[in-house]
Curated annotation (Swiss-Prot):
Protein name: ATP synthase epsilon chain
Gene3D superfamilies noted in UniProt: ATP synthase delta/epsilon subunit, C-terminal domain (1.20.5.440), F0F1 ATP synthase delta/epsilon subunit, N-terminal (2.60.15.10)
Gene Ontology MF term list: ATP binding; proton-transporting ATP synthase activity, rotational mechanism
Primary subcellular site in the record, as a coarse category: membrane
InterPro entries associated with the record: ATP_F1_dsu/esu_C_sf, ATP_synth_F1_dsu/esu, ATP_synth_F1_dsu/esu_N, ATP_synth_F1_esu_C, ATPsynth_dsu/esu_N
Quaternary structure note: F-type ATPases have 2 components, CF(1) - the catalytic core - and CF(0) - the membrane proton channel. CF(1) has five subunits: alpha(3), beta(3), gamma(1), delta(1), epsilon(1). CF(0) has three main subunits: a, b and c.
A GO CC annotation given for this chain: proton-transporting ATP synthase complex
Name of the encoding gene: atpC
Family: Belongs to the ATPase epsilon chain family.
Membrane topology designation: Peripheral membrane protein
CDD domains in alphabetical order: F1-ATPase_delta (cd12152)
Location relative to the cell: Cell inner membrane
Organism: Hydrogenovibrio crunogenus (strain DSM 25203 / XCL-2)
Pfam family, one: ATP-synt_DE_N
Keywords: ATP synthesis, Cell inner membrane, Cell membrane, CF(1), Hydrogen ion transport, Ion transport, Membrane, Transport
Length: 144
């Protein structure tokens, strides 16, 4: 029997994913992490980006705007401020959010305004990257 782990992705809106997986990839503050079953315990902050949950030949993809990744030997929990299934992301809305954030950065008058615009820009860019990666994966597998 193959070794797997329980993966739970939870946001303020509720549980988005709960199931067994062979591997999880997430965008941690210091770079991408890959988690396998029986991984050493870990607690790390997540930055905006894609989370991939791999189980056999299946892969579920999500966008996380920020949150925390907790790893126990047989359980991975992601607590996210916002989590969206990658296929539910709206590219036009993400492009518009990116444009608005870039405009806000140009018009920012304080450090707080700049920081807020940088966060919004990072989230929009991460959404666009998640959409692009999902589209590329679907194209490679012939599902597009």
């Amino acid at each position: 029997m193959a070794v797997s782990m329980q993966v739970d992705i939870v946001s303020a809106e509720g549980s988005l994913f709960s199931g067994k997986a062979d591997m999880v990839f997430a965008q941690a503050a210091d770079g991408e992490v890959g988690i396998l079953p029986k991984h050493t315990q870990l607690l790390t902050q997540l930055k905006p980006g894609q989370v991939r949950v791999v189980s056999g030949d299946e892969e579920d993809s999500f966008f996380i705007n920020s949150g925390v990744l907790e790893v126990q030997p047989s359980v991975v929990t992601i607590l996210a401020d916002t989590a969206i299934r990658a296929e539910d992301l709206d590219q036009a809305a993400a492009e518009e959010a990116k444009r608005r954030a870039e405009d806000a950065m140009e018009q920012a008058k304080s450090d707080t305004d700049i920081a807020r615009a940088q966060i919004e820009l990072a989230e929009a860019v991460a959404q666009i990257q998640t959409i692009t990666k999902l589209r590329d994966r679907l194209h490679k597998t012939g599902l597009s």
